[in-house]
């Protein structure tokens, strides 16, 4: 089976695998042959019922799993560990009938589930009949128009993607009134994110859009290129962060500036996580096109090399495990040996794949001096950090503080009690904090709104 590539995961894989939710996009090796397949909705129904039943370990013994899913299970304490990771949702009350769909070009099955604390769809992603990933999504049996927010309106607006002869669907959220309004473009973190940056029960970009619109600021968010065109991009060996993130953010700024109710002189760019890391590159790309944003907001952005960040995340998540088996330690050692190759990216052939991304992706990042470029930025910049973030930590925040301490155009704020998604949680929860039903903290929205309105 052909390997499936890379830029559609990276940090997302680090996050999701430790909740028992394997990212689909990393290389997937051929599964064992003498095992059952998930090929139809009734298979998915049975698989989920076993997972949530008394003997989830049967899934490892009887059903096909890709190597990546096996790794996720190993690092989660087996399928029982995966089932336990869903405990934050409460006890299972109802399992609905599965229906078939597609995620990133992979066959997927959506199973509506009602738990005592929340209702979600469990999404089972398959590759040639083998289970390749498990994640959560919005509950599809939820009543429409439930708790609709007020005080703004939404308009569908797509970002053109000429090199793929397509577009990225998006939503422009507008305050009430005629405008022209200040506006902000939201730029996703790593992984194949939708316009809401949905992760488990959280939708931080939707929260930001609605919260800022209520403060008189328009917000433009769009589905990420790897979310819409993941199947086309998996074999693009030459793809870099420019293709994955930067060029589309620039196009979004340009299309937003053309909207009648938007003030083109007051457009800001907000990047989260890897999107925040990309902000200096976005600023330079806008300058190269003889345009500019009015200012920039970076949320949970790391100034450190991505490989180093991945290593730290794995170390931390392993530390949360009550016991590390020999097999789990061997898996970790193998991953770290792979990450060690990033210390000499020039030695990599273009078709070498490290942690789910081809060598050109890593070579571009190795040449990207984010701290130096940030120091050279002239526009007002706001950098925000959650103090309970285990993915991008206060160590990263202190690096920014030291590098930017003499830069009058930079403002840095950290928030006690907030996670990587700026929702309430504790670092010691790890990814289980994202199973909570939370929204982006109001203080974060107020601080962003105040910065934009200055």
Predicted regions and their residues:
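N-terminal cap/lid segment of alpha/beta-hydrolase-fold proteins
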Residues: 139-178
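Short beta-strand element of the alpha/beta-hydrolase
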Residues: 180-189
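Cap/lid segment of the alpha/beta-hydrolase catalytic domain
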Residues: 189-244, 315-318, 424-434
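Primarily recognizes the serine-hydrolase "nucleophile elbow" in alpha/beta-hydrolase
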Residues: 255-317
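Accessory cap/linker subdomain of secreted extracellular hydrolases
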Residues: 285, 295-376
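Catalytic active-site module of serine/aspartate enzymes centered on a nucleophile-bearing elbow/loop
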Residues: 421, 427-454
């Amino acid at each position: 089976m052909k390997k499936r590539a890379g830029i559609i995961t990276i940090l997302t894989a680090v996050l999701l695998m430790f909740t028992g939710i394997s990212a689909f996009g990393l290389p997937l090796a051929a599964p064992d042959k003498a095992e059952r397949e998930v090929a139809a909705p009734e298979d998915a129904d049975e698989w989920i019922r076993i997972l949530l039943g008394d003997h989830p370990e049967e899934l490892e013994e009887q059903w096909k799993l890709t190597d990546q899913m096996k790794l996720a299970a190993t690092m989660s304490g087996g399928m029982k560990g995966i089932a336990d990771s869903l405990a934050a949702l409460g006890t299972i009350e109802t399992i609905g009938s599965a229906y078939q769909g597609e995620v990133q070009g992979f066959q997927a099955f959506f199973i509506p589930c009602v738990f005592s604390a929340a209702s979600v769809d469990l999404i089972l992603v398959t590759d040639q009949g083998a289970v390749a990933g498990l994640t959560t999504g919005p509950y599809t049996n939820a009543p429409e128009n439930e708790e609709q927010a007020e005080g703004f309106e939404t308009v569908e607006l797509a970002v053109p993607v000429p090199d793929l002869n397509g577009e990225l669907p998006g939503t422009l959220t507008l305050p009430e009134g005629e405008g022209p309004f200040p506006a902000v473009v939201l730029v996703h973190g790593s992984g194949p994110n939708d316009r809401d940056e949905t992760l488990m029960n959280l939708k931080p970009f939707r929260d930001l859009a609605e919260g800022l619109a209520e403060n008189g600021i328009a917000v433009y968010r769009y589905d990420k290129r790897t979310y819409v065109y993941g199947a086309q991009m998996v074999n693009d060996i030459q793809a870099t962060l420019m293709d994955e993130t930067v060029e589309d953010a620039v196009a979004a700024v340009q299309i937003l500036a053309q909207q009648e109710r938007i003030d083109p002189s007051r457009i800001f760019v907000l990047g989260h996580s890897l999107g925040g890391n990309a902000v200096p590159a976005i600023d330079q790309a806008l300058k190269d096109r003889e345009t500019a944003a009015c200012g920039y907001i970076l949320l949970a952005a790391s100034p450190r090399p991505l490989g180093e960040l991945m290593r730290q995340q794995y170390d931390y998540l392993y530390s949360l495990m009550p016991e590390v088996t020999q097999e789990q330690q061997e898996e970790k050692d193998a991953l770290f040996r792979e990450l060690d190759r990033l210390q000499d990216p020039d030695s990599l052939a273009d078709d070498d794949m490290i942690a789910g991304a081809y060598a050109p992706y890593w070579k571009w990042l190795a040449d990207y001096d984010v701290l130096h470029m940030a120091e050279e930025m002239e526009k007002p910049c706001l950098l925000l950090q959650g103090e309970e973030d285990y993915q991008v930590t206060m160590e990263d925040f202190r690096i920014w503080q030291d590098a930017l301490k003499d830069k009058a155009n930079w403002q840095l704020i950290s928030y006690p009690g907030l996670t990587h998604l700026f929702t309430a949680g504790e670092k010691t929860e790890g990814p289980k904090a994202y199973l909570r039903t939370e929204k982006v903290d109001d203080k974060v929205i107020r601080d962003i709104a105040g910065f934009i309105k200055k």
